[in-house]
């Protein structure tokens, strides 16, 4: 009798999980109102969000559309063979969320754009008050010699940045280096490229704060 009761309890819990997980995904209403996607694509993703307890991520939805990650404040999708779309909700002091969207193209070289929006998907024009993108000079270690610094400046032009969301409201920024490494015929250049640091930022008080210089 006890075993039967436990089985029934487990079944009831499993039935309730999709709705619970979906309800906890606070990105849902902003996905529904996103101006970027067709209503058919939105509905397909919403159906998957309603079935999170029954699937494993990453989950292919159809064609090249794939659900990569979903958390309370995060929704990440693969939108094409080389494209990704990742939305994070950032809390503001007034209690409303700031929509932070990373769009990334992975080929022929990784390249990301980070844009900020109001809850009604109006782009925040003065985004520098929220986040200032690093420049090439920010990725050159100060301990390098003048010769190495000058050479790395050449290698970092043009500069391609890749943005990724990290846990606990963090943002990681790295230089897209695979192409640089494949083109680096000199071992000295390879060592310079491999010394390029990642930048880490923490969301705090309505803007991103650099954690590592």
Model regions: which residues?
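Bacterial Sec-dependent N-terminal signal peptides
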Residues: 1-27
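Terminal domain-start segments
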Residues: 22-92
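Surface-exposed loop/turn elements that mediate protein-protein interactions on large endomembrane-trafficking
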Residues: 64-76, 118-127, 204-205
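Short consensus segments that form the blades of beta-propeller domains
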Residues: 77-78, 104-110, 152, 187-192
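Short, surface-exposed coil-to-beta transition loops
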Residues: 82-85, 109-114, 156-159, 194-197
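Acidic/hydrophobic-patterned starts of short beta strands in beta-sheet-rich repeat architectures
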Residues: 93-104, 166-174
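Short aromatic loop motif centered on NTY/YTY
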Residues: 127-203, 209-213
